[in-house]
């Protein structure tokens, strides 16, 4: 079918090409043979009067025209899928759907493992691809390349729907065998001690406490930067270093590392961990099903305050 001289089937080819960046991968993703893919690319180049991509070493680099077309083509195809082509009925017990989710190791360890356990019971063929924090998660959502983001609500954009999951508190942690670690920290002592800090992605996006320091013009002494919360305990253990971490995660790691919580001498805010999904997936039955599970499992979590007040077992 043609629309204003363009074979609309070529939009699918163009989207695959712009996404995969190689002819072989693009052809495979839409089940086309290599000759058919090459012929389709030639027709696209003729229609747009543009090469669309050039070769640089082993990479194919998109032309400026192709870079401009990429988001528009993906958006058009997603809109067709969500508004015109009805979503397939979803039966959890029979589905083999694979969900792609961006989340931190914090969310994985204190929350998502319960979700995985439940899904394994209710939908044994459903699978997950858990991805690290990306430099541009909003773009991945817009393109429909991921199904969900799970991280602090304050870092989420307003372009897509979201729902709050649970609140979390930040605490200061040090090694329990460090005899020089005080029971209470002054602000000056906290800022001058050697810190382990976590930053995310290739661009080293700041964590919540780092964002707080930046907004208030504060600078602490960061000795080690890691890219996951799970890397903090071994960097603190057996040293005089301290770190600032989510309370639930400290409780998790106290089972295997000699950690001690010290009260923070500054008012770091409590944050809300939330889930966000592409706006175009609002009516996707599979997405709705998993969103309900996420919210239900989050509602069963004990609040950090309750955990702090819980009496120790003799």
UniProtKB/Swiss-Prot annotation:
Signal peptide interval: none
Entry-linked InterPro entries: LysR-type_TF, LysR_subst-bd, NodD_PBP2, Tscrpt_reg_HTH_LysR, WH-like_DNA-bd_sf, WH_DNA-bd_sf
Family, per entry: Belongs to the LysR transcriptional regulatory family.
Function: NodD regulates the expression of the nodABCFE genes which encode other nodulation proteins. NodD is also a negative regulator of its own expression. Binds flavenoids as inducers.
Name of the gene encoding the protein in the UniProt record: nodD1
Protein name stated in the entry: Nodulation protein D 1
Key word Coiled coil present: no
GO MF assignments: DNA binding; DNA-binding transcription factor activity
Pfam families, per database record: HTH_1, LysR_substrate
Domain HTH lysR-type: 6-63
Superkingdom as given in the UniProt entry: Bacteria
Organism: Mesorhizobium japonicum (strain LMG 29417 / CECT 9101 / MAFF 303099)
UniProt entry keywords in alphabetical sequence: Activator, DNA-binding, Nodulation, Repressor, Transcription, Transcription regulation
